[in-house]
Curated annotation (Swiss-Prot):
Name of the protein described by the UniProt record: Large ribosomal subunit protein bL20
Keywords: Ribonucleoprotein, Ribosomal protein, RNA-binding, rRNA-binding
Keyword Membrane annotated: no
Xref: Pfam families: Ribosomal_L20
Cysteine disulfide partners in this protein: none
NCBIfam families: rplT_bact
Annotated source species: Bartonella bacilliformis (strain ATCC 35685 / KC583 / Herrer 020/F12,63)
GO cellular component: ribonucleoprotein complex; ribosome
C-alpha cells in the first residue's frame, strides 16, 4: 500500500483559511494559527449577529411605528391593540414601511384602529355599572 503524505491536503486547508482571513489586520491575515483562531471567532460572531439583526430590525420598526402613531395622537401599544381588534393583520415591517412612504394610508390605518378601540369601549359593559352608590 502506498504511503499517504498530507502535504497537498494541508496546503489546501491552509490556503482556504488564509482566503477567509483576507482583510484581517496584522498577523491574523498571514499566519495559519492566528488566522484560524480569527476566522473561527468571526464565524461565531456572524452566527450570533444573524440572530441579533432580527431583534434590532424589529426594534427599529417598532420605533418608527411608534413615532408615526404618536403624531396621530395614539400610542404604539394602543395602535397594535386597535389593529388586532379591527382584524387588520399587517406585520411591523410593512407597517413601518407604510408609515414612511405612504402617510395617507397609514393615517387610514390609525383611524380604523381608533374606530375599533372606540367601538369596543362603547360595547363592553362597565364592571361598576350595577354597583350601589
Amino acid at each position: 500500500m502506498a504511503r499517504v503524505k498530507r502535504g497537498v491536503t494541508a496546503h489546501a486547508k491552509h490556503k482556504k483559511i488564509l482566503k477567509q482571513a483576507e482583510g484581517f489586520y496584522g498577523r491574523r491575515k498571514n499566519t495559519i494559527r492566528a488566522a484560524k483562531a480569527a476566522v473561527d471567532r468571526s464565524k461565531q460572531y456572524a452566527y450570533r449577529d444573524r440572530k441579533n439583526r432580527k431583534r434590532t430590525f424589529r426594534a427599529l420598526w417598532i420605533q418608527r411605528i411608534n413615532a408615526a402613531v404618536r403624531m396621530e395622537g395614539l400610542t404604539y401599544g394602543r395602535f397594535i391593540d386597535g389593529l388586532s381588534k379591527a382584524g387588520i393583520e399587517i406585520d411591523r415591517k410593512v407597517l413601518s414601511d407604510i408609515a414612511i412612504h405612504e402617510p395617507t394610508v397609514f393615517s387610514a390605518l390609525v383611524a380604523s384602529a381608533k374606530k375599533a378601540l372606540e367601538y369596543l369601549k362603547d360595547t363592553t359593559p362597565n364592571a361598576f355599572e350595577g354597583a350601589v352608590k
